[in-house]
């Protein structure tokens, strides 16, 4: 894997992969535990995310991106596919899934609460579209509960009279880092 860092704090991880004879799945190297080869088929997952994103007023992809920022800021022991999988599952029945970006504060708060309530004994989740098993890398519930509480504080600042925008922004930055929200 090659890491490509950018000055804004975003880092891309580039992994070589090889298209298999079925023209839909890929084989890629896994450097963990002495090395091995793994196979993935991302197209059904991409299609499922695209379909659900369209069904929820294009709120799924921003949620995935925000939660990846949170994962990186808090060094949460979960992979990107698990972030996407959990976001996908959460937004399916979320009451504000079709609202505008003005509800992102509530969406983040409610997602943190939903994640905090995930069973700590659960070892894997099924990825959208492909159904492949996505394994957790460690417990994430404690950090999720902490960020849920911080999001409550941020929303309290946002809804105060008069509104305390600077304080709210500082709380959101405590969760997502200084590049969010801008």
Task: Walk through the language-model features, giving the residues of each.
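Conserved nucleotidyltransferase catalytic core and NTase-mimicking acidic/glycine-rich helix/loop elements
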Residues: 59-165, 170-173, 178-181
């Amino acid at each position: 894997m090659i890491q490509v860092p950018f000055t804004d704090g975003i880092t891309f991880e580039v992994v070589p992969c090889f298209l298999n004879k079925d023209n839909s799945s890929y084989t890629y190297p896994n450097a963990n535990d002495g090395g091995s080869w793994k196979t993935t088929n991302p197209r059904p997952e991409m299609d499922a995310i695209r379909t659900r994103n369209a069904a929820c007023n294009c709120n799924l992809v921003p949620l995935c991106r925000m939660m990846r920022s949170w994962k990186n800021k808090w060094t949460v022991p979960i992979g990107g596919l698990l972030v996407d999988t959990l976001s996908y599952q959460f937004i399916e029945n979320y009451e504000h899934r079709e609202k505008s970006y003005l509800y992102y504060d509530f969406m983040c708060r409610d997602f943190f609460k939903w994640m905090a309530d995930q069973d700590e004994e659960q070892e894997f989740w099924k990825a959208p579209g492909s159904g492949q098993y996505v394994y957790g890398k460690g417990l994430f519930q404690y950090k999720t509960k902490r960020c849920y509480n911080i999001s409550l504080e941020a929303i309290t600042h946002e809804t105060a009279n008069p509104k305390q925008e600077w304080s709210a922004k500082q709380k959101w930055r405590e969760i997502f880092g200084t590049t969010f929200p801008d």
